[in-house]
């Protein structure tokens, strides 16, 4: 900062200053809580989307595996019936 610029100075009653600090702290807490809630909602949406994606992938994998698995079970059950 150059010497030309001077910081503004304010003379204030200490009690008013403390009251102002308390009010600013309360406002800061409200802003932090609001931001936390917004991030939590965004996290829930992302989690839901990831869950849907996992469900689709597992469903697609099972749609390919289950018919083959059913055929294998049928073949094995026929072999068991033939041997008896």
Swiss-Prot record:
Keywords from the UniProt entry: Cell membrane, Membrane, Methanogenesis, Methyltransferase, One-carbon metabolism, Transferase, Translocase, Transmembrane, Transmembrane helix
One Pfam family here: MtrG
Enzyme type, top EC level: translocase
Gene Ontology MF terms in the entry: tetrahydromethanopterin S-methyltransferase activity
Pathway the protein contributes to: One-carbon metabolism; methanogenesis from CO(2); methyl-coenzyme M from 5,10-methylene-5,6,7,8-tetrahydromethanopterin: step 2/2
Transmembrane segments: 50-70
Keyword Methyltransferase: yes
Known EC number: 7.2.1.4
Record's bilayer topology term: Single-pass membrane protein
GO biological process: methanogenesis, from carbon dioxide; methylation; one-carbon metabolic process
Compartment(s) where it occurs, according to its Swiss-Prot or TrEMBL record: Cell membrane
Transmembrane as UniProt keyword: yes
GO CC term, one of those recorded: plasma membrane
Catalytic activity: 5-methyl-5,6,7,8-tetrahydromethanopterin + coenzyme M + 2 Na(+)(in) = 5,6,7,8-tetrahydromethanopterin + methyl-coenzyme M + 2 Na(+)(out)
The protein's role, per its UniProt record: Part of a complex that catalyzes the formation of methyl-coenzyme M and tetrahydromethanopterin from coenzyme M and methyl-tetrahydromethanopterin. This is an energy-conserving, sodium-ion translocating step.
Summary of subunit composition and partner proteins: The complex is composed of 8 subunits; MtrA, MtrB, MtrC, MtrD, MtrE, MtrF, MtrG and MtrH.
Family as reported in the entry's similarity comment: Belongs to the MtrG family.
Name this protein carries in UniProt: Tetrahydromethanopterin S-methyltransferase subunit G
Organism: Methanocaldococcus jannaschii (strain ATCC 43067 / DSM 2661 / JAL-1 / JCM 10045 / NBRC 100440) (Methanococcus jannaschii)
Name of the gene this protein is made from: mtrG
